Amino acid sequence: TILIGHSFGSFVSQGYIEKYGSNIDACILCGTAGPRIALASIGNCFANLIRLFRGPNAIVPMLAKLTFGSYCKRIENPETEDDWLSLSKPNRMMYKMDNWCGIPLTVSFFCDLTAGLKKIHKAKNIKKVPTDLPILFIWGAEDPVGSYGKTIRNLADIYKKNGVKSVEMIEYPNDRHEILNEDDKEKVETDILNYLAKI
């Protein structure tokens, strides 16, 4: 059994392998991020404060801006606030035209997201990852979610220091967040299949 988690799913996957890692044969974390405990803690306090006054289902654009607002900072002349998702313009257009994409996020979403990040990135929880579980990190070099690879490498190093025997990383030059949908997606898919063939 192989667990593959992308983006928000990769955070769920991090939590899963901390609790149930012995139930699977390998884990692939795609477009993920490593610990930023202070940031998650501040964000959680702020989101919970807003929920107290506005209610759990309130839509507060400021929370989305604080979370995702800087994601286009390395993109020259971005056309939309979502350009960080993909290098491919057709992909970005499809995203914009899809009614199920880019939906407003509730205050409760941000409360749960930040609480989850705080939990999975506690040192005592990260140490629960089985040392014999193979883990592969894959990400785009221009993906802001993992701070362009910085926090991903940090998490990989933590796993290694905790004794995880097999931790591998693949970074895709120029790609942004959606590496499974970028123009070089066949390369990404091939790398995943080659990795799985070794397990």
Model-inferred region functions:
Residues 129-135, 162-165:
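Short, proline-enriched alpha-helix->beta-strand connector loops that line the catalytic pocket
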Residues 105-127:
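Active-site nucleophile elbow and catalytic-triad environment of alpha/beta-hydrolase enzymes
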Residues 13-100:
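Alpha/beta-hydrolase-fold enzymes
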Residues 144-154:
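Conserved alpha/beta-hydrolase "acid-adjacent" motif
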Residues 162, 166-199:
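Catalytic active-site module of serine/aspartate enzymes centered on a nucleophile-bearing elbow/loop
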Residues 141-144, 175-176:
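Acidic beta-to-alpha connecting loop that harbors the catalytic carboxylate
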Residues 1-7:
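Alpha/beta-hydrolase fold nucleophile elbow
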Residues 137-139:
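Short beta-strand/loop motif that positions the catalytic acidic residue
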